[in-house]
Amino acid sequence: MTRARRRVVAIGLDMLAVPFTEQLMDRGSLPALAGLRETGTRFLLDHGTAQATGLAWEHVATGRSPNHGGRPSAVEFDPATYQVRQLGTDLDPAFERVDRRTVVFDVPYLDLRRADRVAGVVGWGAHDPGVEPAAQPPELLEEFAARVGPYPASPWLYATPWPTASRCEAMADALADALDRRTDAARWLMTERLPDWDLFFAVSGEVHSAIEGLWHGVDADHPLHHHPSACAAGRGLGKVLSALDRFVAVLTDAAKAVGADVVAFSMGGMGPNRSDVPSMVLLPELLHRHAFGQPLLRLPNAWSKRPSSIPDPLRGRGRALAGGSWIPPETRTGRVRAAAVRQIPPGWRRGLRRSAGSEVDHEGPAEMSLRWQPASRYQPTWAQMRAFALPSFYDGRVRINLMHRERRGVVSLGQYEAVLDEIESVVRACRDPRTGEPVVATVDRPGLADPLGLSPSNADMVLTWRGFAAAFDHPDLGLIGPVPFRRTGGHTGRHGVAYVVSSSLQPGDGGVRSSFDVVPTIIDLLGCDPPDDVCGTSLLTP
């Protein structure tokens, strides 16, 4: 049923550490966000186990959960070739199926190539965009580039600046300036270039990047909180949040000018990063040693002699290793191919990557390389192993080399649970040398019900980590690490948040709701019923 037409401004706050952000609101540091909280209805959002997929914006852009047409991970494993790749979305945008005029700006995982009824620009400066840069109408992309220019903080989107205060300051300055550029671009799109909208939906990802790089500056419990860079990191994170507040102020003022409702939200919460080192480095090496009885990871003695330390890559001999020369080397095939590609003019490289299978065609999903992840360097041995660690951005993910599922499987279906038990026992035996505590918090086995039917983007075992391990100490396999931290912030916050300003809701506390309720709420406020394949329930529904 279609109801009266209304206007909505949706603001994606990608991603907030909610308690910390609201403390700044209470101090008066973020007046625009505080105004939304005071005049609107505040809902805490629970993303559940879907938060670990790292695909929050695919859930928003498509309206689908991992259990309803979505996927459990952006990392796709090919059981025929044992290759892995990180894929963007291949799902249609939810708002394409809503009978309202929608304009978007940098909404991640919203593929405008699959949308005829959605206008705007995507892939300009999003954190994990999930799509190729595109615009609708197509000529807008060139016009936008001429007016706004390229995204100015690209080198800092995934930076790890903690070793120096100057890099923390530079990251914060660049992201704050980029957010101000984003604010100007959003204002132009919504009020001048494409003003005839029912839904204007803009997302900022600068705080996401800032928290991942600078979190140690505001978290007193973080192992790097007393590092010389921490003060600069804390100031820098506050600076980026202030820029976000200016972004929110401009969009909410524009919404008020046309009588539009406002939905500002963060699908999940941010906090300390506990996963990069264990998932990307330590777990792959542990399983390699368990399989072959020898290490692949070669660390400097200066690090190994101090197992309870967190190496600083810019101190002592670590300075020579700051580029990651301690990471297991690529295979000869990978090195030769990478060297050959570097000799080709940049404008020709995309065609080569497509022909080689590392990017799909124009109609397929965007594809990003995973060669930078240490876990990928173990790939040549996966077919010989009973269990191996997949590249991961969050939790540890273990794949069993199962017969009749993997092309060169070595584990029979009858051995499946026993091998899982064995791998879990190996990982649970590991301790953090810095604290003496176990490194594992929880273990899940997604494939138990149907091992042969496990999807290529899923794992047979998923591990969440306890504490901040820079090293594993196993009673038989020895010390692995320590290695330097990567991101200091991660996707560990308990809740996201939504601030909804609408006459359809009473201001105040709305309690805890599912993160999947955000998209149905936006559609409901527009005066439409959500399409059947959109998950969740409108926040307007008690």
Regions found by a protein language model. Give the residues of each.
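Low-complexity, glycine/alanine/valine/leucine- and proline-rich hydrophobic stretches
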Residues: 464-519
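Short, structured active-site-proximal loop/turn typified by the sulfatase FGly-forming signature C/S-X-P-X-R
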Residues: 22-60, 67, 103-105
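Non-catalytic, well-ordered alpha-helical segments in soluble enzyme domains
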Residues: 34, 95-96, 337, 414-433, ...
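Extended, H/D-rich, highly charged conserved domains that either
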Residues: 111, 127-194, 206, 211-219, ...
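Active-site His/acidic residue clusters
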Residues: 191-239, 277, 394-396, 400-414
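Active-site-proximal N-terminal segment of extracellular/periplasmic enzymes that hydrolyze or transfer
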Residues: 1-41, 534
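Beta-sheet entry/capping signal
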Residues: 7-9, 42, 101-103, 187-188, ...
